[in-house]
Amino acid sequence: MAAKKRVVIRNHSAEANLFARRTFITFAGIIILSLVLFSNVYNLQVSSYQKYQTRSNSNRIKLLPVAPNRGLIYDRNGVLLADNTPVYSLEVIPEQVNDIKKRLSEVSQLLDISQEKQDKLLQAMKSKRRFKPIELYSRLSDQQVALFSVSQHKFPGFFIDARLKRYYPFAELTTHSLGYVARINGRDSLALEQQGLAENYAATRNIGKRGLERYYQDILHGTIGHQEVEINNQGRIIRTLDFTPPIPGKDLTLTLDIELQMIAKRALSGKRGAIVAIDPRDGGVLAMYSNPSFDGNLFVHGISSKKYKKLLAPKSNKPLLNRALQGYPPASTIKPLLAITGLDAGVITPETEIYDPGFYQLPGIETKRRDWKKWGHGKVDLTKSLEQSCNVYYYDLAYKLGITRISQMMRKFGFGEYTGIDLHEESRAIMPSIEWKRARYNKPWYTGETLSVGIGQSYWSVTPLQLSQALSILVNKGEIKVPHLLKATTEVVINDKDASTAQTIVTEYVVDEKQPIILKDQHSWDLVLDGLHNTVQKFGATGYAAFKGSKYDAAGKTGSAQTANIEQGEEYDASQVKESKRDNAMFIAFAPYENPEIVIAVAIENVAEGGGGANAGPVARQIMDQYFGDREIISKDPRKHPHHSNDFHQKIKNTAGNH
């Protein structure tokens, strides 16, 4: 018998309840998930909007630094000494070039790029983003720029970029004064960080390394600008959103006269030495030249090790050394200042006479110190001691003064101290004293050393700059003008509201005031200055030949500094000693005698023969001839200098009708 089918009766009520429950659970889940999603959206769009907006902008918007143009440098007459010139470089964007290796080879043939450099460039491209430009060749010549420009259509992705580089048109003529700029290194970066200036140099490649470029770095550099740009996720710039232009550095106008610099270079040609010329009225440096020199442009683009080694080679005679700021034995050029010291101390008077037999001997001492004139000068007073540069007179004066009084007064004239010039490379040189020797050598001071100091020898060294400053103090009768190279700064201020209304602001250099040297009798200045006048204007005086026939009324003092020890009784013969042991020639001069406009110090190393008058004197003469030109400046009042020769008085008569 067949089985009966089982009939299932559906419970519609239960199914409805189950469906309702499932629907409710599903709907509740959707609501919960929606609430969670809405909560997250609210958190992203509202609560954390600022945070994520900032993060987004940091990925999308970049602030790129823009370097300011470096300030220019001019001489006192507006001649450009330091310029910013465009330098052209060949660059490539790799992603825009098909078969970069082939194209690079073709460009290299056109511009003569070596295979070695090509390989280095290809290697460098592997580590850089393909959409960013890569420099292939720097400092393209005008001919190379022209060659590539004609064929540029053949090389898509290759282009020429121009940027400004420092350029010194007078090269070695101004290097020791201007210095130079060179690429910022690790030490520079650390210094900028410590000074809180790193941000202002974010886009700057070069920085002042020496001279005025270094001293006035912050003034010349200017203030960084910014370019706000939008970039994509690959770092490519899409558009510029905002631009804040950089503020250029200030221009410098110097006290230097480039024409005097040219004469200084010519006068020192073939010699090692230095010249410093100062305007005593304000301390402005008119000329400062050290020979040999070097071209600062070599360092701007990065000097090769081969060229740098050449500058350091012994036969190059140390061109990197600024001899104008380095120490030399002053020799007889300091005798006028010792005379001032003796007069002020009451050790001598204008009438004080000594007898010079050709040597000086301390009581009870066998050693004889010789005068430069073998048979001596006979009776010598203050004026004659300067005219004839009598060593015996100053041996005796130094002995009477003692090293302490000498050292104290010489420091007032700036010896052994920084002058304050706006150059970091300055040396203080050495002003010896009892304390100095004890600290340096742990030895006592000897009287014989004092005698050597009396003629500008022993441990005493001075820089040509110090010597010119001391002479400036002398002609100013105690007033001290700090030597300086900066005359004025110039900046262009642009009105934010109206860029067409730019204003040029010139700020003159303010001369620092220093405590003057006050003598017990101010007439002492005139006595010594008159002696210096005679030294140049009186026939037979040591400086007469150098300025014979000049149209201006000059004064000065010669000096010949020993660089080697000469034994007792031994004669000095320049032809018999090696060059490095020969005497140095020194000369100081100023003009005109009344109301001086220029003072000069000259140092020439290891001269073959003759002294300061024969070697350094003519160099000073060339500078002064250039400075005064055709001007005739000769005093018509012989009472101001009664000791002048008949030759000088005749000169006055001959020129009297021209004034």
Where are these regions (language model features)?
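Beta-lactam-recognizing serine transpeptidase/beta-lactamase-like catalytic domain environment
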Residues: 4-13, 82, 231-241, 280-333, ...
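Periplasmic/cell-envelope proteins involved in peptidoglycan metabolism and beta-lactam response
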Residues: 1-305, 327-329, 347-349, 355, ...
